[in-house]
Amino acid sequence: MTQEKIKIHVSNEQTCIPIHLVSVEKLVLTLLEHLKVTTNEIFIYFLEDKALAELHDKVFADPSLTDTITLPIDAPGDPAYPHVLGEAFISPQAALRFLENTSPNQEDIYEEISRYLVHSILHMLGYDDTSSEEKRKMRVKENQILCMLRKKHALLTA
């Protein structure tokens, strides 16, 4: 597959936390370039808690709140054209819930939402977090990527 400009489809259907859509594109492009991932498209949706819980119930028969849902589409290396890496559905409100006891500043909130997006993309790339060892490995990878994104000023912003 030849690498064309990646189409990053971003939909912000929540109003709780402002998300600068250009920062989403920058994070995704920086991450995919860093990991040497070739794809044509990726879809990112920022949803309200209620909408994400409804999707969680529809996809996994579990109506509980969650921070992110990932639906991989084409596996890395799949010759499909156009190659669609997957869809990430993220609740920015989950970051507020997660950080509610820590007196977070704006930077903390956007870093946590950035973590959710990185987490989803890692799932699209085949990472799993069902066992405690897989969770540990995935968290280490997330932390490495967040450090790289921070250095490149590629975390999400308002």
UniProtKB/Swiss-Prot annotation:
Alphabetical list of InterPro entries matching this protein: MetalPrtase_cat_dom_sf_prd (IPR023091), YbeY (IPR002036)
Enzyme class, first EC level, given as a word: hydrolase
Name recorded for this polypeptide: Endoribonuclease YbeY
Gene Ontology CC: one annotated term: cytoplasm
Keyword annotations: Cytoplasm, Endonuclease, Hydrolase, Metal-binding, Nuclease, Ribosome biogenesis, rRNA processing, Zinc
Cofactor binding remark: Binds 1 zinc ion.
NCBIfam families: rRNA maturation RNase YbeY (TIGR00043)
Signal sequence interval, chain numbering: none
Family: Belongs to the endoribonuclease YbeY family.
A molecular function (GO) term: zinc ion binding
UniProt xrefs under Gene3D superfamilies: Metalloproteases ('zincins'), catalytic domain
GO biological process: rRNA processing
Cofactor(s) required for function per UniProt: Zn(2+)
Source organism superkingdom: Bacteria
Protein source organism: Chlamydia pneumoniae (Chlamydophila pneumoniae)
Purpose of the protein: Single strand-specific metallo-endoribonuclease involved in late-stage 70S ribosome quality control and in maturation of the 3' terminus of the 16S rRNA.
Gene that encodes the chain: ybeY
Location in or out of the cell: Cytoplasm
EC number(s) reported in the record: 3.1.-.-
HAMAP family in the record: Endoribonucl_YbeY (MF_00009)
